[in-house]
Amino acid sequence: MKILRKLLFWLILVPILLVLLMQLYFFLQIGWWVNHNPDSTSFMRQQLSVLQDKNPQAQLKHKWVPYKRISNNLKRAIIASEDSNFSGHEGIDWDALEKAYEKNVRKGKVVAGGSTITQQLAKNLFLSGDRSYIRKGQEVVITYMLEYWMDKERIFEIYLNVVEWGVGVFGAEAAAQHYYGTSAAQLSAPQAARLAVMLPNPRFYDTHRGTAYLGRRTDLILRRMGSAELP
């Protein structure tokens, strides 16, 4: 019995220690990124692997640019489209989550997510695209770590540089070049609004750029951009 108790003790303790070590890794890695730009993210590496399964020579389109070299049009458009209370919440917008839940219940399917910019960044940096309560819980923990270490401008700068914008396209600079042949600094308001609208499903819109929904949503974001509060 004594041996069984010891075995049970270690069977319980070891997973707990592994989880705690993982959280420590996340915490310290985020602290490092306060002053150092991430070379890639978990999601970027995952997508590169998918592309290279089809073409071993495939590479991602990605170029880091500083926050000040990204058009305010794009910043305002993304906040208006993805997270209107970005400057006001502490990582999770509980009101937005409640509204998204109510909308999904009315529609009978998932049509709204309610994830903030910080939550999206947490997922992109460290996690897979799998959907589970465990992954969602980890996303929440990383979200609060990001908000602890970084100010809003730094969170937004990293987000703008690593978010997916198409098939193998990551970051504002690569997106501006891919879709409009210009730099992220030179994006016009209509261009920025369209890029922001693509974010929920970028690979689809990369190959379906003329959909009616994309046009309608772009017009709506253009009207909302003026009230977006930048960090």
Swiss-Prot record:
Pathway: Cell wall biogenesis; peptidoglycan biosynthesis
Broad class of the protein's primary localization: membrane
Known EC number: 2.4.99.28
GO BP annotations, alphabetical order: cell wall organization; peptidoglycan biosynthetic process; regulation of cell shape
Molecular-function GO term, any one: peptidoglycan glycosyltransferase activity
Swiss-Prot/TrEMBL catalytic activity: [GlcNAc-(1->4)-Mur2Ac(oyl-L-Ala-gamma-D-Glu-L-Lys-D-Ala-D-Ala)](n)-di-trans,octa-cis-undecaprenyl diphosphate + beta-D-GlcNAc-(1->4)-Mur2Ac(oyl-L-Ala-gamma-D-Glu-L-Lys-D-Ala-D-Ala)-di-trans,octa-cis-undecaprenyl diphosphate = [GlcNAc-(1->4)-Mur2Ac(oyl-L-Ala-gamma-D-Glu-L-Lys-D-Ala-D-Ala)](n+1)-di-trans,octa-cis-undecaprenyl diphosphate + di-trans,octa-cis-undecaprenyl diphosphate + H(+)
Keywords, alphabetical: Cell inner membrane, Cell membrane, Cell shape, Cell wall biogenesis/degradation, Glycosyltransferase, Membrane, Peptidoglycan synthesis, Transferase, Transmembrane, Transmembrane helix
One Gene Ontology term, aspect cellular component: peptidoglycan-based cell wall
Gene3D superfamilies tied to this protein: Biosynthetic peptidoglycan transglycosylase-like (1.10.3810.10)
Transmembrane spans: 7-27
Subcellular location: Cell inner membrane
InterPro entries: Glyco_trans_51, Lysozyme-like_dom_sf, PBP_transglycosylase, Pep_trsgly
Membrane topology: Single-pass membrane protein
Pfam families from the UniProt entry: Transgly
Entry's family note: Belongs to the glycosyltransferase 51 family.
Main function: Peptidoglycan polymerase that catalyzes glycan chain elongation from lipid-linked precursors.
Stated name of the protein: Biosynthetic peptidoglycan transglycosylase
Organism: Herminiimonas arsenicoxydans
Lineage of source species: Bacteria, Pseudomonadati, Pseudomonadota, Betaproteobacteria, Burkholderiales
